């Protein structure tokens, strides 16, 4: 890869990416220096922030269209519309979870919606006690794959990176799907796959579902 990267955010996800992309990162921005973003340009912008930097990123991309990967969650409807607007000018890849495993689970649910509707559906999401959003962005992503909204329960405890359990109940049977993260490297690897994907695109809005269809 012969490209330069602007990395927004300096939290756990960003730190897992930095060793893997150290030869390509031009600068790492956080809430203390995000105002400096306009002074830099790169081939790719990766947003790993907590969404507090959105306005700076939006203004930057309007002036400097850049292939963009959005890993942050919790965007408002207005912000999502702004992201879609930007995707008319440049490729934007967005996901609440960059794990291929979660993408496979979502595909299974979408492909079998009619049958799954016959079950009572539940999602349980487990994360570390400092996790801010509840339910998690991943739970919301999984919820969007159902045609009928499942019941969601969020548990925040200990130092769990991330675990999601989907239960489908009928009178005489139960289906359980569990996805557990044991290392944040799984997200970093997914982001690197999305970099390879987005480098081939000129504009448009893309998700892990699009990436999965091209693997």
Regions found by a protein language model. Name each.
Residues 4-39, 117-215:
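C-terminal substrate-binding/catalytic lobe of Rossmann-fold NAD(P)-dependent oxidoreductases
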Residues 58, 80, 105-106, 135-139, ...:
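Conserved strand-to-helix beginnings and helix N-cap segments that scaffold or border functional pockets
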Residues 70-72, 94-95, 122-126:
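Short, conserved beta-strand edge motifs with alternating hydrophobic and charged residues
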């Amino acid at each position: 890869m012969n490209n330069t990267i602007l990395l927004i955010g300096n939290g756990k996800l960003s730190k897992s990416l930095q060793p893997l992309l150290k030869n390509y990162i031009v600068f790492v921005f956080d809430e203390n220096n995000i105002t400096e973003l306009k002074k830099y340009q790169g081939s790719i912008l990766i947003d790993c922030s907590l969404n507090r930097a959105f306005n700076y990123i939006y203004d930057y991309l309007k002036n400097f269209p850049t292939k963009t990967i959005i890993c942050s969650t919790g965007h408002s409807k207005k912000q999502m519309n702004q992201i879609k607007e930007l995707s008319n000018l440049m490729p934007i890849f967005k996901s609440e979870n960059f794990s291929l495993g979660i993408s496979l689970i979502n595909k299974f649910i979408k492909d079998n919606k009619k049958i799954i509707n016959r079950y009572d559906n539940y999602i349980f999401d487990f994360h570390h006690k400092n996790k801010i959003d509840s339910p998690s962005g991943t739970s919301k992503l999984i919820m969007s794959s159902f045609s009928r909204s499942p019941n969601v329960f969020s548990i925040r405890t200990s130092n769990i990176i991330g675990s999601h359990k989907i239960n489908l109940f009928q009178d005489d049977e139960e289906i359980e799907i569990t996805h557990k993260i044991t290392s944040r490297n799984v997200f970093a690897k997914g982001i690197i796959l999305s970099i390879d994907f987005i480098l081939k695109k000129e504009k448009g809005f893309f998700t892990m579902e699009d990436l999965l269809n091209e693997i």
